[in-house]
């Protein structure tokens, strides 16, 4: 730490000098600047700083390093700044990069050399007369390496209010513990009183927990039970696992409990089979101070009993645990110091924390509650989160205004709009206005241009719909706005760093000073909801008063809104309590601008004649604001309670299907289009109207086209009804006519039922539980693994191009499955497909009209309706019980048994033994599903052989001959990009052996580390892999994405969902490197963060179950909604934290999935135009099936469900 802090000032001075020069400077000029004596105090660099630069390798090595490439560009002995817009290099950003640079240098030197360097630096610093000139002004003037100095002077007051230890039972004990800080100035190998106190403090918590456990039990307890209890119940309280670490450090519970220091507390009995412990006096209360003193004696005796090396290890370990607890588990001393007026000065963090503590005790509305939830992040210097929360609402207001205005609007117009909306009456007005002024409104509007956001077609939305889209978190536009501003803030976060404290203090000041009634009355989210809900009913009332009657009673108004003949359609509106809200507002004469209420009668205001939708929206919004400003607390509370009962998720699905007698007003705004339904007059969006027309056309044309097929199937069904059912048979040979007719009976009955449903509602042939099943004999063979279930689908798809002969079919099957199935099995499958009418009975076998209809792409039918597939992928439908239940036992059902895993290990061992015949050392490594832990019962074994001395590919033929002597079904594939040898081992385990290709090992490790972050990730990866394998779309040599590619798609999806489950493990790959040699791409950086422990708690924000995540995966990639992935515009890259547009080299590729390590490699480049269509069909099919509430996993994997 001292080394890095000494480098700060030279680097910052060099940065300021280069910025002042405004041009490139030579390395010679830079060396003169740093090492020449300077009279100017601002540029004066002390001897310790110069020594640090020299020991760090010199300026050339420092400035050309990867760690400082964000600030300096070094080329041909010239130095220039990367970003000239920066005024300086902030210490919080620069210091970690210097630490990383020094760690890289340290790895290149021996421990003795590095200790000598540190000793020289420390000695030189101590000789310095004024230590303050060694460091920048915002870095503590201390030579200590304590972890607390990672936080700088701006937060010193906050650190002083932190308490290292928590409350205890005795004042004396508090005094003792307050002196337990680690003094880093002392020798690390010295046993000091502070370190003994720290070890005793760490031991105190687990010992107290052990006492509690023993008091509950009436007899002595086995130590094994105690360890298990501590691990399961996590009884380590405030210090996490630090106490248990110290227990292990001192030899475990046995050594500790055997000590004489704790003899007055515990009685320990050791037998041959058990090690039991009990309390000496279970009823007596043990004083915490006495226990702490005993533990101090114990720790002191342990230290003194150790040798030099063991003592040094124990002291270092306890010191690290103490530092970790100091930085992570300390509590703030919350005071009640009032916050001061913050204009240009930063308010102390102590005061902000006090206000934060106060406001958390109140009740607030949803939008403000989101900001309260983020306050803790603001205090951790999350300026990007603060700016996103403050800038989101201005962007929402600007977008709504632009769409309702229907014209180009000037920047001045939006500036004036923001001044009016976010005035002093707004609860966060001061904070938002200060943020806009600090950053610059023009800069925000230029960077966050409305054109950056996908345009919403105004013709396809009703008047109030834009409010729902912008302000309801369930709608797509809200998330788009949030992502847009989040992306811009993250890119420019360094520019706002100085203004962070001021903005933070203003926000806390606004929230803490606002009263409850003020917040309820002026909260924007509630007002937008009320406006959006009330506009359409108010239009209905105004039209009725203009065209039919001049007045209406309040009861008549409510009847008009609900509709007399449309009770079923509008029952959901009644559930939303809209009538209660409207009647309440009318009774209090809120809308007197255009509606007058007097003695139970509602009339039009004669002075109001502008009833355009935009003007009506403005008036409703203004009326609500005026009412809420001037109303009493009781009235506000009543409105708030009504507003809270409005279910916005239900409202957003209604799409304003209200019965409106006069639609002239709505035709003026071109917001909706009128269409007549057979049951009632409803208004639906134009996009829905187009889907309805396509649906009707499909129903008429397709049913007429296949009418003859339906008649033939009905006759077959009538004949089958007279025949007998299946007779049970133990052999696997289909009997003659009875089995044939009954098989056709069962399948045809289901198929006709599907046609009937198709005829009535015009949807796909998959309707709930109506599905085609194989005959009982085929089903039985599938269950016994005589042949795979997807063999039926494989043969069915091959009939698209036609199967010329039976021998050709055998060749197809062997090429794909690498196994020769008996002729009888293949003939049974052909006969079954022939009997249900899917393929022809003569060679060449081709699809019939029925089979072609079954494989037809659903988008050509227009059947993907919003009624079947919700726009919200994560809609928590309670009917997904059957799917969730089928997924619970999924992993156990497909996981390989111990026999298969043992056989795989035996194959590796046998292969390694056989390859010893080659010259030189040969190593074998596994990759793929065996390494990632995603194996199933049918998974292959992927192996690679390599040598550290030479390439093994020249020994290809010799290795092939060795394998032929040991294994069966050997198939060499020499012409592939990566030559492999396929063979089969024990228990029919298929193996692939490659040469010198080490990159897949790191690919597999990356998948493994992602799966360790959350238990749902592994399950979802196995589900998608298993689904792709069953649907025959997981083999690259058949022009489909590989299993590895599907895993990458799953990981990218879990990174992009609204509440991400997975982080980016390659985020810091530009600072670290792990080079692996690849034959085609040269040196490849395969570094990623393998420490996944830190992500397990922070990333698990949303607890969506597997069923919803699986459905969301297929909807994300398979549909073409606003929420879905745009294959034409973007590409998948899990090493990037944000969506990336297709580069020019991939613009002609339909799918682009980048390799995490090879940035120029598209994992889906082998896909053809036909295979892309098949993949999209399969994704859409899965989404359709999972959209049915009664679906389960069998439906998803069944080859005969469309």
Curated annotation (Swiss-Prot):
Top-rank taxon, per record: Eukaryota
Database matches in CDD domains: NT_PAP_TUTase
Domain PAP-associated: 1105-1159
Disulfide-linked positions: none
BP term (GO), one: mitochondrial RNA catabolic process
GO cellular component, one term: cytoplasm
Molecular function terms, GO-annotated: RNA uridylyltransferase activity
UniProt cross-references to Gene3D superfamilies, sorted A to Z: 1.10.1410.10, Beta Polymerase, domain 2
InterPro entries named among the record's database cross-references: MTPAP-like_central, NT_sf
PANTHER family for the chain: CAFFEINE-INDUCED PROTEIN 16, POLY A POLYMERASE CID PAP -RELATED
Protein name per its UniProtKB record: Caffeine-induced protein 16
Source species: Schizosaccharomyces pombe (strain 972 / ATCC 24843)
Designated gene of the protein: cid16
């Amino acid at each position: 730490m001292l080394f890095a802090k000494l480098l700060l000032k030279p680097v910052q001075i060099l940065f300021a000098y280069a910025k002042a020069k405004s041009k490139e400077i030579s390395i010679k000029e830079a060396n003169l600047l740093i090492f020449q004596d300077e009279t100017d105090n601002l540029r004066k660099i002390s001897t310790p700083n110069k020594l640090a630069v020299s020991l760090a390798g010199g300026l050339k090595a420092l400035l050309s390093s990867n760690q400082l490439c964000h600030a300096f560009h070094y080329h041909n002995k010239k130095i220039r700044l990367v970003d000239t817009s920066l005024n300086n290099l902030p210490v919080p950003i620069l210091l970690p990069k210097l630490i990383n640079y020094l760690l890289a240098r340290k790895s290149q030197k021996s421990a003795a050399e590095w200790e000598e360097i540190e000793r020289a630096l420390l000695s030189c610093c101590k000789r310095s007369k004024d230590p303050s000139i060694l460091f920048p002004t915002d870095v503590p003037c201390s030579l200590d390496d304590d972890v607390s100095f990672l936080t700088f002077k701006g937060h010193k007051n906050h650190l002083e209010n932190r308490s290292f230890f928590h409350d205890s039972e005795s004042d004396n004990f508090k005094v003792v513990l307050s002196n337990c800080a680690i003094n880093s100035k002392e020798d690390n190998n010295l046993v000091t009183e502070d370190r003994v106190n720290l070890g005793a403090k760490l031991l105190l918590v687990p010992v107290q927990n052990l006492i509690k456990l023993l008091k509950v039990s009436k007899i002595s307890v086995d130590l094994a039970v105690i360890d298990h209890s501590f691990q399961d119940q996590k009884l380590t309280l405030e210090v996490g696992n630090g106490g248990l670490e110290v227990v292990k450090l001192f030899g475990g519970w046995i050594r500790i409990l055997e000590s004489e220091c704790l003899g007055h507390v515990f009685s320990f009995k050791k037998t041959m089979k058990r090690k039991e412990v009990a309390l000496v006096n279970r009823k007596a209360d043990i004083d915490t101070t006495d226990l702490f003193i005993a533990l101090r004696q114990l720790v002191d005796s342990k230290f003194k009993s150790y040798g030099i090396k063991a003592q040094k290890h124990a002291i270092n370990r306890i010191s690290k645990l103490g530092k970790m607890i100091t930085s992570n588990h300390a509590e703030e001393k919350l005071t009640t110091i009032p916050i001061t007026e913050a204009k240009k000065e930063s308010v102390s963090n102590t005061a902000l924390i006090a206000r934060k503590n106060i406001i958390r005790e109140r009740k607030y509305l949803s939008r403000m509650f989101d900001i309260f939830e983020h306050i803790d992040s603001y205090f951790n210097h999350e300026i990007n989160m603060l700016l996103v929360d403050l800038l989101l609402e201005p962007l929402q207001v600007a977008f709504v205004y632009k769409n309702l205005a229907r014209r180009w609007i000037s920047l001045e117009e939006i500036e004036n709009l923001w001044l009016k909306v976010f005035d002093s009456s707004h609860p966060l007005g001061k904070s938002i206005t200060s943020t806009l002024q600090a950053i610059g409104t023009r800069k925000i509007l230029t960077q966050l241009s409305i054109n950056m956001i996908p345009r919403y077609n105004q013709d396809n939305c009703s008047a109030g719909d834009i409010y729902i889209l912008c302000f309801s978190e369930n709608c797509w536009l809200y998330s788009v706005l949030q992502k847009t501003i989040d992306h811009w803030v993250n890119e420019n976060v360094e520019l706002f760093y100085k203004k962070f404290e001021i903005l933070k203090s203003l926000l806390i000041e606004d929230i803490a000073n606002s009263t409850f009634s003020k917040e309820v009355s002026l909260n924007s989210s509630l007002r937008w909801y009320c406006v959006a809900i009330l506009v359409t009913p108010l239009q209905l009332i105004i039209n009725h008063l203009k065209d039919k009657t001049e007045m209406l009673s309040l009861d008549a108004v409510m009847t008009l809104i609900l509709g007399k003949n449309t009770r079923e359609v509008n029952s959901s509106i009644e559930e939303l309590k809209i009538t209660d809200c409207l009647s309440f507002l009318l009774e209090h004469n809120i809308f007197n601008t255009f509606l007058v209420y007097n003695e139970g009668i509602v009339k039009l205001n004669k002075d109001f004649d502008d009833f355009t939708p935009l003007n009506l929206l403005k008036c409703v919004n203004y009326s609500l604001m005026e009412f809420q400003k001037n109303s009493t607390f009781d009235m506000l509370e009543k409105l708030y309670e009504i507003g809270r009962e409005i279910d916005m998720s239900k409202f957003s699905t209604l799409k304003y299907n209200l019965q409106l007698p006069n639609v002239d007003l709505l035709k003026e705004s071109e917001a909706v289009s009128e269409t007549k339904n057979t049951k009632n007059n409803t208004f639906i969006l134009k996009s829905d109207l187009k889907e309805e027309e396509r649906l009707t056309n499909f129903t008429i044309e397709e049913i007429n086209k296949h009418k003859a097929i339906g008649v033939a199937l009905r006759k077959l069904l009538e004949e089958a009804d007279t025949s007998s059912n299946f007779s049970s048979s133990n052999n696997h040979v289909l009997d003659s006519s009875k089995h044939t007719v009954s098989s056709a009976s069962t399948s045809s009955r289901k198929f006709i039922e599907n046609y009937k449903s198709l005829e009535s509602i015009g949807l796909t042939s998959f309707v709930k539980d109506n599905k085609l099943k194989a005959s009982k004999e085929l089903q039985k063979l599938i269950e016994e693994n005589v042949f795979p279930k997807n063999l039926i689908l494989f043969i069915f798809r091959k009939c698209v191009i036609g199967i010329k002969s039976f021998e050709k079919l055998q060749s197809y099957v062997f090429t794909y499955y690498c196994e020769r199935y008996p002729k009888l099995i293949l003939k049974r499958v052909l006969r079954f497909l022939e009997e249900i009418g899917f393929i022809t009975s003569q060679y060449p076998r081709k699809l019939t009209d029925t089979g072609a209809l079954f494989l037809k792409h659903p988008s050509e039918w227009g059947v993907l309706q919003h009624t079947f597939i919700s726009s919200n992928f994560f809609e928590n439908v309670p009917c997904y019980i059957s799917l969730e239940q089928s997924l619970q036992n999924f992993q156990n059902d497909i996981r390989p048994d111990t026999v298969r895993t043992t056989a795989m290990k035996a194959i590796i061992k046998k292969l390694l033994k056989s390859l010893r015949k080659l010259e030189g050392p040969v190593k074998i490594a596994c990759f793929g599903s065996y390494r990632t832990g995603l194996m199933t019962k049918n998974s292959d074994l992927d192996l690679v052989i390599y040598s550290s001395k030479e390439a093994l590919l020249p020994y290809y033929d010799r290795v092939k001959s060795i394998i032929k002597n040991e294994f069966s079904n050997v198939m060499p594939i020499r012409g592939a990009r990566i030559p492999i040898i396929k063979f089969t081992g024990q228990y029919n385990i298929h193996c692939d052996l490659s040469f010198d290709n080490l990159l897949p090992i790191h690919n597999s490790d990356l998948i493994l580390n992602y799966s360790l972050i959350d238990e749902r990730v592994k399950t979802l990866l196995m589900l998608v892999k298993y689904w792709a394998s069953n649907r025959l779309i997981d083999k690259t040599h058949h022009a489909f994405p590989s299993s590895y590619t599907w895993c990458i798609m799953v990981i990218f999806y879990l990174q992009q969902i609204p509440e991400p489950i997975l982080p980016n493990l390659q985020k810091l790959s530009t600072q670290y490197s792990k080079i692996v040699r690849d034959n085609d791409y040269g040196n490849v950086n395969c570094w990623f963060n393998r420490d996944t422990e830190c992500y397990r708690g922070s990333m698990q924000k949303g607890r969506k179950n597997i069923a919803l995540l699986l459905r969301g995966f297929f909807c994300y990639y398979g549909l073409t909604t606003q929420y879905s992935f745009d294959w034409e515009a973007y590409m998948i890259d899990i090493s990037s934290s944000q969506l990336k547009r297709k580069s020019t080299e991939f613009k002609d590729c339909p799918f682009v999935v980048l390799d995490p390590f090879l940035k120029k490699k598209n994992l889906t480049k082998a896909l053809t135009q036909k295979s892309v269509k098949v993949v999209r069909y399969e994704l859409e099919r899965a989404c359709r099936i999972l959209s049915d509430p009664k679906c389960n996993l069998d439906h998803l994997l069944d080859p005969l469900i469309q």
